[in-house]
């Protein structure tokens, strides 16, 4: 039986006892999947996981998304994004967002593995967009229900290219903007699996609201 410790009333659960060095059986995979649907974000503390095991775990949820159009990848694993922040490459994202909403098909989930973390700071924060919707007054729910948002690669366009960017990074951004263009999505949507209503817009990728 899967051991899940609830973190907050709205979001988050810690799962213990998973050994990523061995294949995860189907029953455990299914339990993790349903824990993710229930808690929306789940954590595996002090888990030792290789890039190969990372991909194998991702495949247990379905087909892995194509390589990220902008960020570099882990050597030998093009489907794993490598994010490295230091004094030369400071963080370029500091805004609430849902990953890749500019794509035609939004990914089901993202799996993050922290390899090196600072003693202070460096936090990644999560929020529940369904809990945020539930707390809106009824007149605001009705108002937002008639609106749509146009999503594009705005955050990358605005923050990824800087004076220190290479010609290669600028070209990758250019190619990705042409490739993905824009996608129009309702501000309020229902999750296709859980049926929960949630807010699907964010300052990182929404160009404007119509």
Which positions does each model-derived feature cover?
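Non-heme Fe(II) oxygenase catalytic core, chiefly the N-lobe of the double-stranded beta-helix
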Residues: 2-210
């Amino acid at each position: 039986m899967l051991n899940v410790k609830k973190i907050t009333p709205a979001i988050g659960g810690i799962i213990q006892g998973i050994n990523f060095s061995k294949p995860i059986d189907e029953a455990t995979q299914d339990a993790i999947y349903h824990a993710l649907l229930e808690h929306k974000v789940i954590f595996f503390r002090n888990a030792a996981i290789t890039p190969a095991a990372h991909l194998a775990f991702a495949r247990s949820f379905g087909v892995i998304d194509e390589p990220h159009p902008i960020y570099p990848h882990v050597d030998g694993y093009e489907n794993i994004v490598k994010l490295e922040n230091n004094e030369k490459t400071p963080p370029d994202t500091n805004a609430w967002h849902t990953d890749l909403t500019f794509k035609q098909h939004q990914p089901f989930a993202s799996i993050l593995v922290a390899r090196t973390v600072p003693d202070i700071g460096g936090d990644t924060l999560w929020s529940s967009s369904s809990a945020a919707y539930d707390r809106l007054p009824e007149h605001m729910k009705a108002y937002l229900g008639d609106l749509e948002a146009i999503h594009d690669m705005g955050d990358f366009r605005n923050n990824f290219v800087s004076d220190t960017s290479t010609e290669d990074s600028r070209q990758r951004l250019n190619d990705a903007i042409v490739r993905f263009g824009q996608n129009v999505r309702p501000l309020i949507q229902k999750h296709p699996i859980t049926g929960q209503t949630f807010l699907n817009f964010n300052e990182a990728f929404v160009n404007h609201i119509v």
